[in-house]
Amino acid sequence: MTAPKSKKSGDNVNAKLGLAIKSGKYTLGYKSTIKALRQGKAKLVIIAGNTPALRKSEIEYYAMLAKCTVHHFQGGNNELGTSCGRLFRVGAVTIMDAGDSDILTAELS
């Protein structure tokens, strides 16, 4: 039995994230997210839902210092990796340039 489809907004985030990955600048992973936040290059950080609390709070702290927006992804790191078009797990995604996507200005809920 398959799980029911997620809400439209979840699909909307996936589509915008996919477009940002294809046309913009981004980094994947915890270490590169922290590095981009410390350098002030990050504009949006997306954190997987099953990221450990300590890592999540550390990313949120650096994002607060960098005045960067943080979005908590509804799915886990497997789903976030799939949304990025990767075959591996991704705990955090940093968008530095959205490219053709309007992910930075859109309401991500």
UniProtKB/Swiss-Prot annotation:
GO cellular component: cytosolic large ribosomal subunit
Pfam families, sorted: Ribosomal_L7Ae (PF01248)
Record's keyword terms, sorted: Ribonucleoprotein, Ribosomal protein
InterPro entries tied to this protein: Ribosomal_eL30-like (IPR039109), Ribosomal_eL30-like_sf (IPR029064), Ribosomal_eL30_CS (IPR022991), Ribosomal_eL8/eL30/eS12/Gad45 (IPR004038)
Gene Ontology BP term (one): rRNA processing
GO molecular function, one term: RNA binding
Assigned protein family: Belongs to the eukaryotic ribosomal protein eL30 family.
Protein name, per record: Large ribosomal subunit protein eL30
Species: Yarrowia lipolytica (strain CLIB 122 / E 150)
Gene name linked to the record: RPL30
